């Protein structure tokens, strides 16, 4: 493995369009694809690219994120040298500054950057789903002689950037004087003084910046071609390991074109849906075009279509819940749903 790059995951962003899913967790900790969290994709991409030092800068509701990542063992980042670093900045929440961006958080922990041995830094958010080889980005960056390389996909920024660590230190030192608060501001407003290059990523990618996009991307994973683009045997996506028994299918259990994690009990019908670990589907229940997160219970005779049910929620027997792909109906984490609701 090379050790030319350090990884920086900016988890300071709050996106209102994701609000129902992030009331009790950071965006990076939102469950995705049956057994993962959103942060797993960029973190695994970094590790698979030989990055041995990764710093995560959280801001909101980060307890579940810390619990998920732990020591970094599942990503081979529990190291004596380098490894996984977690840098919250609670003082900034009460600083009184009009705007607090990522650079303010980086400045609070500037020693991490000053002590880093890596020549280059990759800055990424924690909510872009992709499986990218940052080594390839680095090679292109060096070949083109760029100051900053921005990774894009089909005309859209993936909010991932590669630059020299020394330049990043300069940007952090000067951000107040120049009025930029994150690398995004630098790219948008100060590109004339820097050489900005673009790297076009050709694999599957999705920036999860709304409930609608979360739902759409989850449904896209049911397409085998999409799944195979994202989950590459040579570049696996790592996550927190949990031991669960195999899923149990009852006599009336029926599953079509769905993703079912371990530990589930299926006694009804599941079609075109994503079920996380330890979900229970009652007898006669019908679940279509829906996302059911871990440890949820769906009562007998329920009908769900176009629904996202957050972790540890319960839907009582006979309840009908219907949403649309543009506006899925959401049952919040840990709640009990006992009404018949359609959209």
UniProtKB/Swiss-Prot annotation:
Signal sequence bounds: none
Tree of life domain: Bacteria
Pfam families, A to Z: Hexapep_GlmU, NTP_transferase
Function in brief: Required for the synthesis of glycogen.
Organism field: Geobacillus stearothermophilus
PANTHER family (alphabetical): GLUCOSE-1-PHOSPHATE ADENYLYLTRANSFERASE-RELATED, GLYCOGEN BIOSYNTHESIS PROTEIN GLGD
GO terms for MF: glucose-1-phosphate adenylyltransferase activity
Annotated family: Belongs to the bacterial/plant glucose-1-phosphate adenylyltransferase family.
GO biological process: glycogen biosynthetic process
Name of protein: Glycogen biosynthesis protein GlgD
Cited CDD domains: ADP_Glucose_PP, LbH_G1P_AT_C
Keywords per UniProt: Glycogen biosynthesis
Transmembrane segments: none
């Amino acid at each position: 493995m090379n050790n030319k790059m350090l990884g920086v995951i900016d988890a300071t962003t709050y996106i209102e369009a994701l609000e129902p899913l992030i009331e009790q967790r950071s965006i990076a900790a939102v469950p995705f694809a049956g057994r993962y969290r959103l942060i797993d994709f960029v973190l695994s991409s970094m590790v698979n690219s030989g990055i041995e030092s990764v710093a995560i800068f959280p801001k909101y509701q980060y307890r579940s994120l810390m619990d998920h990542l732990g020591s970094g063992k599942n990503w081979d980042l529990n190291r004596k040298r380098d490894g996984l670093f977690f840098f919250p900045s609670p003082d900034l929440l009460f600083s009184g500054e009009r705007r607090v961006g990522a650079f303010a958080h980086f400045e609070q922990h500037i020693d991490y950057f000053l002590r880093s041995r890596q020549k280059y830094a990759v800055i990424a958010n924690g909510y872009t789903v992709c499986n990218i080889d940052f080594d390839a980005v680095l090679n292109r960056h060096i070949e083109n002689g760029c100051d900053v390389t921005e990774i894009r996909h089909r005309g859209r920024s993936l909010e991932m950037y590669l630059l020299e660590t020394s330049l990043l230190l300069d940007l952090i030192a000067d951000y107040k004087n120049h009025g930029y608060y994150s690398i995004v501001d630098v790219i948008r407003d100060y590109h004339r003084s820097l050489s900005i290059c673009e790297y076009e990523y050709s694999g599957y990618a999705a920036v999860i910046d709304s409930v609608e996009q979360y739902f759409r991307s989850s449904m896209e994973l049911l397409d085998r071609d999409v799944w195979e683009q994202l989950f590459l045997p040579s570049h696996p996506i790592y996550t927190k390991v949990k031991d669960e028994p195999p899923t149990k299918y009852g006599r009336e259990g029926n599953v079509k074109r769905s993703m079912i994690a371990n530990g589930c009990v299926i006694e009804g019908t599941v079609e075109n849906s994503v079920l996380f670990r330890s979900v229970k589907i009652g007898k006669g229940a019908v679940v279509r075009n829906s996302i059911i997160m871990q440890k949820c219970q769906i009562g007998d005779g329920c009908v769900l279509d176009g629904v996202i049910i957050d972790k540890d929620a319960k839907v009582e027997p006979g309840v009908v819940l219907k949403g649309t792909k543009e506006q899925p109906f959401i049952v919040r984490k840990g709640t009990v749903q006992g009404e018949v609701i359609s959209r």
